[in-house]
């Protein structure tokens, strides 16, 4: 949900700043935003949003590439996330002892891996031959490793005062970000353009092993991680939102440098990238620098939009995972994309129903009935660009079953359909929405992230401000209408984590 972006940006700011102190500055920002924000698009299609702000001589940026796990196809799931890892491995001039020799070693490594992969994927693999080829592949990998200067990209940024160097991959985007002193802007332009102009696939298979271990730790060894993955698979039977961002293990074990290069060639087109720059910069001074460095990226066609549309669901789906773990209960309801006119109403429902200790679910299930130790609502799973999921979830208290939690939760959902919310609940939602926006404007990093996200999702960064006005216009009747439309059994996917011991014959309930 779009309001989630406000909340995420708040985390990047000093939330403790008094609202009364921040509000005048925020109001001034909104009034003067268009005067201080420049949108500049290069000839190759790359768009930059530049917001000049007074204050510290620093700037923050966020680059959003319009590609995530939803753009992957079977066989290469996890490759968007994998390329994010590769983007920190340096450039032809940074992170290597001898780039030309290293490239020859990487080419030989790739050929060795593909030969090994063909052998082990044969219908009747020759075990001895497979092991011989694996040994040859590992030898090539060790040879390529001798040219690597570890952490060179990270060190180059931190050495010049950079902070917050990171990136993230979601179902629909890959985002890169950090902050630097303003007098290091040309360094930013060089590093960021260079790593996308000349991507290197340094330590690719070593990093692939890291990603596989990440999957093992976060999904395969975590019952709740497995539950959410199965939930997505059950809720989406056509749309690629069902694919995990980290990828399926069978794909991680087999995709190659060749696959990664092909993926980059299609999706890392300048027309598919937007960068927001916020802080102590002057657009007139930095645009020539942007042109000089980022203008080097060759123009490519913007990839075609995703065609697949999830068909309407006609029946409730229930999945149950049994493990030696705390029971966990999730209901997921399909909802429209974040650009739908009803999006602010979904935010209101989420706020009133399940956000925080004053929400209906928390008060009813946790405090009053003591059926759960946690109860909340969330949106935006696994993304917001396409129709996605609205979640209601609860963790049963000791001795309470998922069935008991389910019944109590559904009572609260149906109240949203059959009864008006109170004036106090609606007013609290609108007040918090404004407060979240105000706080999100205080930090350069959070604001850069919001600008680039709103611009790519809605086509206009101004939606960052107009959206709060749309939330202010939500009515009680709107909430009942949308709740009646979404909280239907046929629109529901249920995921249950049951304690295996409690289900076994003679097990305790």
What is each model feature region?
Residues 8-20:
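Bacterial N-terminal signal peptides
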Residues 194-201, 293-301, 410-421:
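A common structural junction motif
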Residues 68-73, 93, 198, 283-284, ...:
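Short beta-strands and strand-coil junctions in structured, solvent-facing domains, enriched
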């Amino acid at each position: 949900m779009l309001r989630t972006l406000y909340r995420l940006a708040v985390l990047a700011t000093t939330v403790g700043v008094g609202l009364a102190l921040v509000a005048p500055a925020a109001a001034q920002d909104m009034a003067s935003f268009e005067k201080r924000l420049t949108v500049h698009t290069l000839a190759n299609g790359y768009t930059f949003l530049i917001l000049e702000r007074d204050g510290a001589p620093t700037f923050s940026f966020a680059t959003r590439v319009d590609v995530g796990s939803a753009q992957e196809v079977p066989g290469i799931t996890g490759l968007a996330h994998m390329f994010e890892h590769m983007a920190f491995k340096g450039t032809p001039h940074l992170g290597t002892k001898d780039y030309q020799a290293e490239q020859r070693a990487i080419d030989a490594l790739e050929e060795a891996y593909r030969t090994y992969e063909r052998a082990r994927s044969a219908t009747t693999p020759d075990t001895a031959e497979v092991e011989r080829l694996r040994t040859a592949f590992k030898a090539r990998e060790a040879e390529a490793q001798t040219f690597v200067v570890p952490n060179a990209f990270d060190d180059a940024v931190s050495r010049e005062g950079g902070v917050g160097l990171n990136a993230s991959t979601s179902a629909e985007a890959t985002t890169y970000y950090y902050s630097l002193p303003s007098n290091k802007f040309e360094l930013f332009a060089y590093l960021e353009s260079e790593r996308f102009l000349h991507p290197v696939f340094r330590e690719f298979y070593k990093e692939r092993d890291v990603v596989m271990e990440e999957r093992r730790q976060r999904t395969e060894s975590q019952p709740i991680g497995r539950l959410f993955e199965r939930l997505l698979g059950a809720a989406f039977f056509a749309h690629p939102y069902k694919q995990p961002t980290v990828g399926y293990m069978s794909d991680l074990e087999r995709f190659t440098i060749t696959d990664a290069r092909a993926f980059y060639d299609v999706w890392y087109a300048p027309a598919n990238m937007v960068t927001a720059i916020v802080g102590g910069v002057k657009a007139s001074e930095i645009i020539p620098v942007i042109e000089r460095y980022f203008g080097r990226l060759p123009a490519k066609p913007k990839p075609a939009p995703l065609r697949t549309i999830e068909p309407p669901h006609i029946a409730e789906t229930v999945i149950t995972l049994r493990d030696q773990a705390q029971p966990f209960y999730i209901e997921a309801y399909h909802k429209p994309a974040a650009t739908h006119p009803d999006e602010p109403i979904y935010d209101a429902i989420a706020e009133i129903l399940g956000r925080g200790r004053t929400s209906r679910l928390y008060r009813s299930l946790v405090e009053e009935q003591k059926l759960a130790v946690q109860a909340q609502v969330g949106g935006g799973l696994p993304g917001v660009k396409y129709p996605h999921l609205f979640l209601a979830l609860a963790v049963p208290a000791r001795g309470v079953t998922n069935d008991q939690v389910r019944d109590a939760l559904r009572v609260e959902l149906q109240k949203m359909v059959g009864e008006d919310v109170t004036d106090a609940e609606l007013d609290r939602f609108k007040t918090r929405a404004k407060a979240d926006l105000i706080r999100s404007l205080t930090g350069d990093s959070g604001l850069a992230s919001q600008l680039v996200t709103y611009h790519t999702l809605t086509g206009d960064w101004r939606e960052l401000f107009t959206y709060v006005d749309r939330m202010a216009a939500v009515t009680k009747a709107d909430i009942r209408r949308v709740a009646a439309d979404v909280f239907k059994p046929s629109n529901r996917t249920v995921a249950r984590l049951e304690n295996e011991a409690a289900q076994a014959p003679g097990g305790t309930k």
